[in-house]
Amino acid sequence: MKKQVLRIGVGGPVGSGKTALLRQLCLSLRDKYNMAVVTNDIYTREDAEFLTKNDALAADRIIGVETGGCPHTAIREDASMNLAAIDELQARHNDLDFVLVESGGDNLSATFSPELSDLTIYVIDVSAGDKIPRKGGPGITKSDLLIINKIDVANLVGASLEVMDADTKKMRGDKPFIFSNMKTQQGLADIISFIEKEGMLSL
């Protein structure tokens, strides 16, 4: 019987660094785990092509889903295209350990269907300003892990990491969050530890 593959949803607004995170996760984990990726773009397969061109994973381990119209629907109300892509990846590669499912660029109110994602990671970035965490929305408050990316630009945009830290704690309670910079891999080890622990991959 085919084992149930761990599905990790990665969401967040356009430009927050979702694809850069996926690339770093692939480069760091591909030799340790049997993994694959599904990306969602509205009219193109741009993110899937980026990962392939940047040698993140072999091309047959990446499927780009063209959602058309509203990208929220493909990860929430009708996840059938994404579920079919996961089935296809499982058919290609026996005993996958996990699949990363990247949502199309979405807003703070988008969430993954429980049937599509066992663990949800939500990525926001500092360049949008330090008010983003307190705006709330399911991505900020309910994701299993919140990543606050691009901390290197905080001074450039006048954002306070201290304010973001305090607001995020207020909005998330005990739920974890990590400050990161994918260019320098800052925070990456903590993100990987979270995935391994919560996904029970290291057992």
Swiss-Prot record:
It is found in: Cytoplasm. GO terms for molecular function: GTP binding; GTPase activity; nickel cation binding. It comes from Alteromonas mediterranea (strain DSM 17117 / CIP 110805 / LMG 28347 / Deep ecotype). This is Urease accessory protein UreG. Keywords: Chaperone, Cytoplasm, GTP-binding, Nickel insertion, Nucleotide-binding. It comes from the Bacteria. PANTHER family: UREASE ACCESSORY PROTEIN G (PTHR31715:SF0). Homodimer. UreD, UreF and UreG form a complex that acts as a GTP-hydrolysis-dependent molecular chaperone, activating the urease apoprotein by helping to assemble the nickel containing metallocenter of UreC. The UreE protein probably delivers the nickel. The keyword Signal does not apply. One of its GO terms (biological process) is urea catabolic process. Belongs to the SIMIBI class G3E GTPase family. UreG subfamily. Facilitates the functional incorporation of the urease nickel metallocenter. This process requires GTP hydrolysis, probably effectuated by UreG. GTP binds at residues 12-19. GO terms for cellular component: cytoplasm. Its main location: cytoplasm.
